[in-house]
């Protein structure tokens, strides 16, 4: 008998029709990359994926963070004869110390002489005969569910052997995006959610030295690293933004500062995406959360972009965003008290209902192309793997 890890991928992949094989191949490739320095064997048994390794804990810790993997199960592989299935089932139930149980069988191997219902009844009957009054069957609300998978071999496990994974779609299957990453709570969550949908994720951070410190930059680098744990690698572009901000402050109205700065961030992200062949922009904006994120503000920001702008948090409450941040381990880093370029030079009364035509007129005082190109020419690049 061997202990293996059963890999269950997101049910959405089953719905991909003729593209299903592409998604499966990409998911396998991503799993293997995650396990490149762990000795393991990838086993396929009648469309089920299993991983064999001496370091099962290490495999679980990494594979549960692979986008596209829905669930991992620590299973025991037994020979296909029925006695070994019954004995392993009995052992699992004893280990669970449950007072009630239920058996569920998936018989994919149609050559096996019993159907799924017959296997469940026979295994359950054997357990009852061995344990007597210690346990009972409860098909509605059992303390322990015993699962039997019959394929080329047979596999036995319980619901206590299941580990929830991140789900989503295989990373790298759905194009690419440039995430405008700040040091706050929202944008790392937006980056994670886009990556979870299979979108190759890159990040740009706007640094306002000397008004923002090196610790603020280090904080954003750490956030990129954390998001990068879920991806193959992640690239962070650090763009100097001070000159742009000072020019805007000097030449534009105070109540328009925030939205014009936001439009410049969009332009820089778009120009950088053009150079790096990245298809879209992603932000951590949520409708109505701050003054620049009114419907009118978002429309004016979008006007400065020549690419699709995705906002995965757009209709989420702050509490929901914070819950995800905690789940993915970005929250504690995000709340470190270092200011970013979005929190300095904030006007007392920012315009909440800006108009595109007004911003275009205001920006005529600025050399947009020169400012954007100079910022990109002076940027730093960090790659985290």
UniProtKB/Swiss-Prot annotation:
Stored PANTHER family = TRNA SULFURTRANSFERASE (PTHR43209:SF1)
Which domain of life does the protein's organism represent? Bacteria
Q: Which residues form the THUMP domain?
A: 57-160
Please give the family membership noted in the entry. Belongs to the ThiI family.
Xref: PROSITE patterns = THUMP (PS51165)
Location in the cell reads: Cytoplasm
Q: Which GO terms describe its cellular component?
A: cytosol
This protein's name: Probable tRNA sulfurtransferase
Fetch the Pfam families from UniProt.
ThiI (PF02568), ThiI_fer (PF22025), THUMP (PF02926)
What SUPFAM superfamilies does its record include?
Adenine nucleotide alpha hydrolases-like, THUMP domain-like
- What are the GO BP annotations of this UniProt entry? thiamine biosynthetic process; thiamine diphosphate biosynthetic process; thiazole biosynthetic process; tRNA 4-thiouridine biosynthesis
EC number of the protein = 2.8.1.4
Q: What is this protein's function?
A: Catalyzes the ATP-dependent transfer of a sulfur to tRNA to produce 4-thiouridine in position 8 of tRNAs, which functions as a near-UV photosensor. Also catalyzes the transfer of sulfur to the sulfur carrier protein ThiS, forming ThiS-thiocarboxylate. This is a step in the synthesis of thiazole, in the thiamine biosynthesis pathway. The sulfur is donated as persulfide by IscS.
**Quick one: which residues bind ATP?**
180-181, 205-206, 262, 284, 293
Look up keyword Signal and say if it applies: no
Organism source for this protein? Clostridium perfringens (strain 13 / Type A)
Reaction(s) the record says it catalyses:
[ThiI sulfur-carrier protein]-S-sulfanyl-L-cysteine + a uridine in tRNA + 2 reduced [2Fe-2S]-[ferredoxin] + ATP + H(+) = [ThiI sulfur-carrier protein]-L-cysteine + a 4-thiouridine in tRNA + 2 oxidized [2Fe-2S]-[ferredoxin] + AMP + diphosphate; [ThiS sulfur-carrier protein]-C-terminal Gly-Gly-AMP + S-sulfanyl-L-cysteinyl-[cysteine desulfurase] + AH2 = [ThiS sulfur-carrier protein]-C-terminal-Gly-aminoethanethioate + L-cysteinyl-[cysteine desulfurase] + A + AMP + 2 H(+)
GO MF terms here are: ATP binding; CCA tRNA nucleotidyltransferase activity; tRNA binding; tRNA-uracil-4 sulfurtransferase activity
Q: What class of enzyme is it?
A: transferase
């Amino acid at each position: 008998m061997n202990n293996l890890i059963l890999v269950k991928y997101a049910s959405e992949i089953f719905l991909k029709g003729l593209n299903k094989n592409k998604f499966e191949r990409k998911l396998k490739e991503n799993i293997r990359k995650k396990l490149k320095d762990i000795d393991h064997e990838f086993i396929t048994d009648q469309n089920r994926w299993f991983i064999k390794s001496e370091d099962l804990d290490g495999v679980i810790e990494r594979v549960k963070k692979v986008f596209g993997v829905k669930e991992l199960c620590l299973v025991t592989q037994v020979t296909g004869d029925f006695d070994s299935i019954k004995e392993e089932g009995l052992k699992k139930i004893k280990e669970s110390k449950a007072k009630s149980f239920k058996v569920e069988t998936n018989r994919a191997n149609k050559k096996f002489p019993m159907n799924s219902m017959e296997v469940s009844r026979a295994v359950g009957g054997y357990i009852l005969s061995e344990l007597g009054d210690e346990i009972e069957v409860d098909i509605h609300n059992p303390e322990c569910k015993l699962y039997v998978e019959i394929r080329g071999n047979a596999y036995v496990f319980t619901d206590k052997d299941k580990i929830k994974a991140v789900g989503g779609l295989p990373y790298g299957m759905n194009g690419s995006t440039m995430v405008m990453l700040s040091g706050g709570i929202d944008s790392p969550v937006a980056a994670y959610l886009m990556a979870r949908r299979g979108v190759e994720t890159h990040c740009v951070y706007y640094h306002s030295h000397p008004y923002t410190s090196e610790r603020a930059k280090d904080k954003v680098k750490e956030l990129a690293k954390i998001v990068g744990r879920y991806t193959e690698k992640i690239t962070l572009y650090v763009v100097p933004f001070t000159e742009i901000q000072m020019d805007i402050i000097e030449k534009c109205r105070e109540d328009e500062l925030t939205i014009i700065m936001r439009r410049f961030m969009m332009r820089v992200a778009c120009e950088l995406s053009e150079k790096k062949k990245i298809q879209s922009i992603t932000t951590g904006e949520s409708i109505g959360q701050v003054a620049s994120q009114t419907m009118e503000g978002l429309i004016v920001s979008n006007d400065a972009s020549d690419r699709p702008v995705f906002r995965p948090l757009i209709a989420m409450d702050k509490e929901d965003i914070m819950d995800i941040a905690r789940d993915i381990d970005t929250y504690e880093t995000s709340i470190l008290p270092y200011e970013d370029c979005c929190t300095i030079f904030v006007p007392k009364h920012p315009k909440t209902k800006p108009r595109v035509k007004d911003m275009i007129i205001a920006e005529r005082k600025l050399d947009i192309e020169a400012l954007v190109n100079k910022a990109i020419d002076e940027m730093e690049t960090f790659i985290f793997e």
